[in-house]
Amino acid sequence: MQTLYSSIINENMKKTVTLLGDYFFYCFTVLSLITVAGIVFTPAKGFLYEEFIKSLDPKGQKRAIEVFDQKLAAAGLSREIFNPMLLIRKRSRELLVLSDDILVATYPVGIGRATIGIKLNGKDQKTPEGQYYICRKDAENRFHLFLQINYPSPDDAKRGSVQQIIKAGDEERIEAAWESNSCPPTDTALGGPLGIHGFGAESSWTTDGSISLHNIHIEELFWNIATGTSVAILP
């Protein structure tokens, strides 16, 4: 009797689980059809479709690689012979992607709030000037994507040492990072980390010293430019 009773309970439980599974599958199917219908038939279907595609690739990697391949082809280049260098002009607020002497792409940028002059310390809100390289890539940065440059460089450290801005030993630590192709210390009075990131490049957009781009543009840089790439920042 007990065995028969248990069998009936187990059978009822199986039916209940099956019905619940069918119910959730039905609801998921209906919601999916409603979503697709909304994308297809609404006047804003183009916008919704674009947003849907973006949700599948929130950091823009696939699109960025495809678009950059087109820019390389337009410049007569392939990835095999692409030798990237980034040139940033503060006065004209633009970033140029070069391969040797060939221009591949140009992007508008935002720069530090104090727009004129060499960066002297971590609080002056200036974008540094000089020769740097990309020392780190951060895909989880609060500014969408981040390419850290190796500021402060040995030149920045030497200037800071002469002007007694940094402490004894700081210059040596910064020089050691340069020689090992790694990111320099950011705990000195020269500040950092600084780099190239997303979240906007309008003429009124200013930063604490980094270089800002529109998100679609930093995506193109981030997914196509490697660490170690040279970055020249001009007045």
Whereabouts are the PLM-identified features?
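N-terminal pre-domains immediately preceding structured catalytic cores
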Residues: I8-P235
